[in-house]
Structure formats: C-alpha cells, structure tokens
Amino acid sequence: MSSYLLVLVAILGFAYAEGDYSLCQQREKLDDDMREMFTELHNGYRAAFARNYKTSKMRTMVYDCTLEEKAYKSAEKCSEEPSSEEENVDVFSAATLNIPLEAGNSWWSEIFELRGKVYNKNGKTSNIANMVWDSHDKLGCAVVDCSGKTHVVCQYGPEAKGDGKTIYEEGAPCSRCSDYGAGVTCDDDWQNLLCIGH
C-alpha cells in the first residue's frame, strides 16, 4: 500500500486544475473536494501511464454530473459487480479516510495484470482499462453506504470499451491529439502527456 501512496504523491505533483464541480447535486457522502480528487487522481494516473506506456492520444478527464447520476443509480443497488463495461466498483468493509485514493489505488493495482494494449474482458483488468482507456474523457462517481460497507462506483465516457478493442494507441505522448478533431491539443498542465479539448 505504501508504494501506491508514493506513486500517488508523485503523480499528483504533475498539476492542479481548477474545476467547477458545484453544478452537480450535493450529496451526503460526495462533496466537490472529493469530485475534484477523483478527477485529479484519474488524470495523474493517466499522465503516468502515458509517460510509461508511450500513449499517443490519452485524453484529460473532466468530471461529468450526468455520469455521476448513472453511478448513483448503480451504486444504490449495492452490487459488488459493475453494471456496465464503463463502470468501476470498489467496496470497503472498514471506514477509510480517503475514499477516492482507496478506490483509485485498488483499481490501479490491476496494472500488474495488464498484458498489451488490447482489452480482454476475461482478464483481470477491467478497472485499469477504464482508468486508462485513451478516448475516455469524462467520469462521474458515487459513494454510498450499503449495510455498513462503503460502495464506490465510477462511470466513464464516452462508451468505448469492448473485448478485443485497443485500450490505447502507442506513440510519443500527445502526438495524435488531433485525431480527436480540431481544437484538441496537448495539455501543458499535465506536462504535455494528455490531450485536452473537444
């Protein structure tokens, strides 16, 4: 666990981006600071992945209130299984001080199972695939109590994931941002490792 904390400290040192998370419904277990932390955590991991795996068009993620609503509908079912391909689920049996960090580290730990850049739904990499799918540029998360356990769900968009599909394209980081269209450029807030814009 301590190695994950060191990695997190290193990747969150990349950048701090301002965001307006106040447009989402206010929740008992999820505030704007947590929304921001989920977003920055994902972008930090994506930047580290882009650097180490040489991804050519990894997008910066932004927080999305519509995806948060979908995540809450799923989380309130208290299932420990994802309801869709574009969903990560984590369940804690004990109280944790930092829910985004705990869930993010759990999902990120699948990096050690990742073999190549093609997604295999029978592998143990569904969560990491969602975190680093290069065309995902939105996320929304939910935190709910279910019979004394904390359920964390994050939904990702746009839909892209599928068995046999490519998780990321190789190449120099940011070298293919323009594949997403005019106006998509390299994000210097993330050391020119992630693409930003729509």
From Swiss-Prot:
GO cellular component labels: extracellular region
Function: Hookworms inhibitor of platelet aggregation and adhesion. Native protein inhibits platelet aggregation induced by ADP, epinephrine, and thrombin. In addition, it prevents adhesion of resting platelets to immobilized fibrinogen and collagen. May act by binding to glycoprotein IIb/IIIa (ITGA2B/ITGB3) and integrin alpha-2/beta-1 (ITGA1/ITGB1), respectively. It is noteworthy that the recombinant protein fails to inhibit binding to fibrinogen (through ITGA2B/ITGB3) and collagen (through ITGA1/ITGB1).
Cystine pairs: 24-65, 78-146, 141-154, 174-186, 177-195
Tissues/organs with expression: Detected in cephalic glands.
Superkingdom to which the source organism belongs: Eukaryota
Species of provenance: Ancylostoma caninum (Dog hookworm)
Main subcellular location of this protein, as a coarse class: secreted
Additional detail: The RGD motif is not positioned at the apex of a tight turn, making it unlikely to interact with the integrin.
SMART domains according to UniProt: SCP
Presence of the UniProt keyword GTP-binding in the record: no
Keywords, alphabetical: Disulfide bond, Hemostasis impairing toxin, Platelet aggregation inhibiting toxin, Secreted, Signal, Toxin
Record-stated family: Belongs to the CRISP family.
Entry keyword Cell division: no
Gene3D superfamilies for the chain: CAP
Assembly behavior: Monomer.
InterPro entries on file: CAP_dom, CAP_sf, CRISP-related
Native organism taxonomy: Eukaryota, Metazoa, Ecdysozoa, Nematoda, Chromadorea
Localization, UniProt: Secreted
Protein name, UniProt field: Hookworm platelet inhibitor 1
